């Protein structure tokens, strides 16, 4: 009787432990716990006041492909579970936008008040150099729970990305010297084009900080190539806390404040840059003081479409799941 009871107990232990062992093996094959090193590189886009209003116009205008910009960097990735990994990314790149992208649609309009016409006539452009670092969580929904499903065992997986980041940007814009006719990129942060930080200007916005927080959100598709290599395609959007990535946010200020707060040479450049509607395009003359230059209700953002490659190191520790 005692021997029989022991056999039944051993059989029960084996019955309960076998699924756990099988699941552990399957989980290890799917995504072992451990460290990965990799890189990403792809196309970058700025979403702000400068440029087009719609996403479709952004990508389909006939001038977009003339000046593509890119971003890339390195990453360290640690797999906590087949469905969850944490990543540390460091990236550098440039983003760009121009009101010239509205020309194609502006030509079709019959009213000067049309948004395409107004944007094109504003005549602004912007290029930002960006350094960023972010800590993000990578969530693979099809590998959450059971590892027995066909979806969980697939080499190719869709994943979601979310986290927090910190970045530094330096905005540039094209400036044409009226004396020489030479056009070049100049830094515009120190020109305070909307009066930021001007203490003698009523209602002036706070001085712009070039260091900002961001919330990265993304979606991607990755595929295992052998035991260690992984390659994927990822779209990542960075929601920022500033409306000055493109140097345009609110209203046209009285140009006298440039003379009161900047050197004579800086003031001359600032006057030319803050209101570029004087360029003979569709609307002649300058914008009235106090009229809208941008939309202060929406912060700027930027995004990337990147190829992601990383190498998974073999872990010596056992999985906890």
Write out the residue ranges for each language-model feature.
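Extracellular loop and loop/strand-boundary signature of outer-membrane beta-barrel proteins
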Residues: 57-62, 119-126, 146-149, 201-207, ...
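Residues that define the transmembrane beta-barrel architecture of outer-membrane proteins
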Residues: 33, 68-70, 129-133, 156, ...
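Repeated loop/turn-to-beta-strand initiation elements of outer-membrane beta-barrel proteins
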Residues: 47, 83-86, 144-145, 228-231, ...
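Predominantly the C-terminal beta-signal and adjacent terminal strand-loop region
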Residues: 226-321
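Residues on the lipid-exposed face of transmembrane beta-strands in outer-membrane beta-barrel proteins
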Residues: 39-43, 74-78, 88, 135-139, ...
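Gram-negative (and chloroplast) outer-membrane scaffold detector with strong preference
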Residues: 82-186
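Outer-membrane beta-barrel strand-turn architecture
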Residues: 31, 78-82, 141-143, 168, ...
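Surface-exposed strand-loop-strand hairpins of Gram-negative outer-membrane beta-barrel proteins
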Residues: 43-71, 75
């Amino acid at each position: 009787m005692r021997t029989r009871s022991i056999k039944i107990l051993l059989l029960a232990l084996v019955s309960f432990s076998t699924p756990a062992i099988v699941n552990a093996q399957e989980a290890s094959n799917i995504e072992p716990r451990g460290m990965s090193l990799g890189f990403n590189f792809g196309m970058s886009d700025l979403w702000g006041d400068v440029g087009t209003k719609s996403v479709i116009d952004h990508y389909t205008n006939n001038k977009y492909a003339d000046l593509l910009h890119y971003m890339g960097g390195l990453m360290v990735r640690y797999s906590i579970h087949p469905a969850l990994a944490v990543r540390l990314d460091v990236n550098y790149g440039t983003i760009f936008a121009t009101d010239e992208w509205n020309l194609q649609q502006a030509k079709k309009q019959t009213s000067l008040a049309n948004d395409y016409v107004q944007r094109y006539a504003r005549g602004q452009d912007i290029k930002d150099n960006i350094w960023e670092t972010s800590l993000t969580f990578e969530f693979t929904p099809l590998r959450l729970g059971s590892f027995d499903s066909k979806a969980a065992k697939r080499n190719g997986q869709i994943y979601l990305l979310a986290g927090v980041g910190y970045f530094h940007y330096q905005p540039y814009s094209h400036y044409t010297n009226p004396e020489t006719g030479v056009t070049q990129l100049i830094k515009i942060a120190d020109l305070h084009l909307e009066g930021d930080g001007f203490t003698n200007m009523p209602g002036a916005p706070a001085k712009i900080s070039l260091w900002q927080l961001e919330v990265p959100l993304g979606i991607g598709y990755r595929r295992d190539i052998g035991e260690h290599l992984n390659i994927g395609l990822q779209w990542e959007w960075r929601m920022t806390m500033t409306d000055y990535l493109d140097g345009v946010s609110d209203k046209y200020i009285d140009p006298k404040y440039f003379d009161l707060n900047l050197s004579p040479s800086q003031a001359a450049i600032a006057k030319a840059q803050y209101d570029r509607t004087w360029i003979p395009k569709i609307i002649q003359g300058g914008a009235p003081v106090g009229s809208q230059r941008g939309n202060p209700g929406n912060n700027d953002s930027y995004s990337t479409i990147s190829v992601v490659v990383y190498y998974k190191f073999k872990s010596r520790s056992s999985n906890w799941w």
